[in-house]
Amino acid sequence: MSTFTAACVQITSRTDVHDNLKVTTDLIRQAVDAGADFIATPEVTNLLEPNKAAAQEKAQLQDDDITLAAFREIAAETGKWLLAGSLVIKKPDDDRLTNRSFLIGPDGAIVAQYDKIHMFDVELQNGESHKESRAYAPGDKAVLADTVWGPFGLSICYDVRFSHLYQQLALAGARVMTVPAAFTETTGQAHWHILLRARAIENGAFVIAPAQCGQHSEKRRTYGHSLIIDPWGEILAEAGDEPGIILAEIDLDQVAKRRQQIPNLKNHRDFDLVVPDSIATAAE
């Protein structure tokens, strides 16, 4: 198969897992009815809880997570591919949580899972700060997933700022990159479109980026603007700043076409870095 219809589900997750699940599954079913073959939800779909202790209490182990179970049931019922962009999952051997993405096949089986590698630890100019590593344990493995349409590269949100991750996924065969996210309104306005289009262009790959949107709590507001981008960097579909769905046709023949026109993956070369002693000494 060289073509399929992709959908992004855009939501405003808050602190009630059951409410979040109801809203998300309703939108997933809307995407199914609209003809989507592959449906992706945002980062932290099941829970966006700013309080670490409360998040620990509400999060569940993977085998017990009600959102994951519901998504698997929907995938099996509808025969669609479903990406749970990420779920907040409790670790059995750690007091930190896991920010984990799940790719679910049309039979309801988990095809692949990916733990977010790069933690969002930032201090922004407006006084806004985030320290994801306080509550979450980072992953240490990049994941390439096998689908009926070929390899997908999995990532989550802040990962998008680390271009080498996507280059390695593309070199390993990824033609589609998934970037579920919960970008803040501040960073989203400044960087969201630029970063995602850059990842698509430099790797000649489709990018599917479902996003959180709106006001989640007193101090947390996300940008929205879920995007589906082609290998030339053109935006095929874009959401606004409210919950909903977007859809776009994915023609994977475009990947080979763009990579032939600009073969930067083929032209990639390793290199040595020459650092003068004066600079090396100053850095120590």
PLM features: what roles do these ranges have?
Residues 15, 45-48, 118-120, 254:
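Feature marks short, surface-exposed loop/turn motifs that line or immediately flank catalytic pockets
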Residues 62-84, 151, 157-246:
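CN hydrolase (nitrilase-like) catalytic-core segments centered on the catalytic cysteine
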Residues 19-29, 161-167:
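Short, acidic/polar
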Residues 3-15, 40, 100, 113, ...:
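Active-site-proximal beta-strand elements of phosphoester/diester hydrolases
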Residues 17, 25-107, 113, 183-199:
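Cys-nucleophile CN-hydrolase/nitrilase-fold catalytic domain and related Cys-dependent amidase chemistry
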Residues 84-86, 100-103, 143-145, 226-228, ...:
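Short beta-strand scaffold segments in enzyme catalytic cores
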Residues 253-284:
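A short C-terminal boundary segment appended to hydrolase-like catalytic domains
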Residues 92-172, 185-194, 261-264:
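Active-site catalytic loop in hydrolytic enzyme cores
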